[in-house]
């Protein structure tokens, strides 16, 4: 297994009207023996980054290290990596056993050892009973397990997966991602997993690297990414329903939502620059952190429910608030929320996220800057 270190990595493609930058100055370390997801929207550069780690693309600039080994110029077959792609590519006329063992075909491994390794990996992937069957006799999920087994049997230094579950049904995807996480922990294989699906990334990852326009927006554990987003892009990309962002003004320790008299008092430790004049910010609140209560005469934030999505254990209410351009999203376990009814909307000061209104960067207690004079 290996730690993957990317230094000042850049990838530029030639296009008819000039150049297209796919990866722009990526510096990061992917930890040994962990599962790290490269997460981002389509076109953000995550697959290009994975292909450079694999050796399928050559960096325009920068270096790639596996532990202390510079592998930037090393051919893909000599890097000690295994890769599983989105499309399941099994040999249709070979048995499951032969498909799995194919990963060792060009290595000098005794036949008895190969058989034992195939048996072991098939048992771990719960496909031992299918070893003598052909791929067309298997379900999509079983075929993907065979593809995983063929890659893992080589004991790779780094295991790379490019959206391997996107073509599978939802229930199969959920089951397979659980099995993959358990297997990765058991084998302690350094794993890099590309996905655009935030739910998969949150469920699978030890760490997540969020990419946008070829650059890293944030890297951290799923909890860090969700609870402490580095900017509004991360805050809006992670979490479903999407975070609410309100324009607000910070006056000392008082946070007031623009266009209303509704506000909250923040602790001085949460807002170090508490003595400043008013600062324009974006106030972020997760839908699960908002509360609905009957309309009152107080100066509260309020909105009228226009739609309730019934999702089972919790519902999502969408409210029209006169002071906002967008509907406010509230996740609630209450069953008595009615459409076309007005409610007060409240939240705990400890649940707010503050962002600079101009840059979108998170405002932390240790780096809240003074407003421009």
Which sequence ranges carry the predicted segments?
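ABC ATPase nucleotide-binding domain
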Residues: 5, 29, 65, 344-346
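The feature captures the beta-strand-to-loop junction immediately N-terminal to the Walker
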Residues: 39-41
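Helix-to-loop junction immediately C-terminal to a conserved catalytic motif
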Residues: 54
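Conserved ABC transporter NBD signature motif
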Residues: 62-70
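ABC ATPase nucleotide-binding domains
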Residues: 74, 79-86, 90-236
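Non-catalytic connector elements of ABC transporters
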Residues: 252-373
């Amino acid at each position: 297994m290996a730690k993957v270190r990317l230094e000042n990595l850049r990838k530029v493609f030639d296009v008819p009207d000039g150049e297209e930058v796919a990866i722009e100055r990526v510096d990061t370390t992917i930890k040994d023996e962990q599962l790290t997801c490269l997460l981002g929207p389509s076109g953000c550069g995550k697959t290009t980054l994975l292909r450079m780690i694999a050796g399928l693309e050559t960096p325009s600039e920068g270096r790639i290290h596996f532990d202390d080994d510079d592998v930037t110029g090393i051919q893909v077959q000599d890097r000690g990596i295994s890769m599983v792609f989105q499309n399941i590519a099994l040999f249709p006329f070979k048995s499951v056993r032969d498909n799995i063992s194919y990963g060792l075909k060009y290595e000098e491994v005794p036949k008895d050892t190969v058989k034992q390794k195939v048996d072991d990996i098939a048992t771990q992937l719960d496909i031992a009973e299918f070893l003598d069957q052909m791929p067309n006799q298997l379900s999509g999920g079983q075929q993907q397990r065979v593809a995983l087994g063929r890659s893992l049997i080589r004991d790779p230094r780094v295991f790379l997966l490019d959206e391997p579950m996107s073509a599978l049904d939802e229930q199969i995807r959920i089951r397979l991602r659980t099995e993959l996480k358990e297997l990765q922990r058991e084998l302690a294989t350094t794993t890099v997993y590309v996905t655009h699906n935030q739910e998969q990334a949150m469920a699978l990852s030890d760490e997540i690297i969020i990419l946008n326009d070829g650059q890293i927006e944030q890297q951290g554990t799923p909890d860090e990414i969700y609870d402490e987003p580095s900017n509004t892009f991360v805050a809006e990309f992670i979490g479903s329903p999407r975070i609410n962002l309100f324009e607000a003004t910070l006056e000392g320790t008082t946070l007031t939502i623009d266009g209303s008299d509704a506000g909250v008092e923040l602790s001085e430790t949460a807002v170090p620059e508490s003595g400043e004049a008013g600062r324009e910010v974006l106030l972020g609140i997760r839908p699960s952190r908002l509360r609905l209560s009957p309309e009152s005469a107080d100066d509260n934030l309020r909105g009228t429910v226009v739609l309730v999505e019934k999702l089972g254990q919790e519902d999502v209410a969408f409210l029209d608030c006169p002071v906002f351009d967008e509907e406010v999203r509230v996740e609630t376990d209450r069953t008595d929320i009615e459409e076309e009814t007005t409610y007060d909307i409240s939240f705990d000061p400890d649940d707010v996220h503050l962002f600079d209104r101009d840059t979108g960067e998170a405002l932390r207690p240790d780096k809240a800057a003074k407003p421009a004079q």
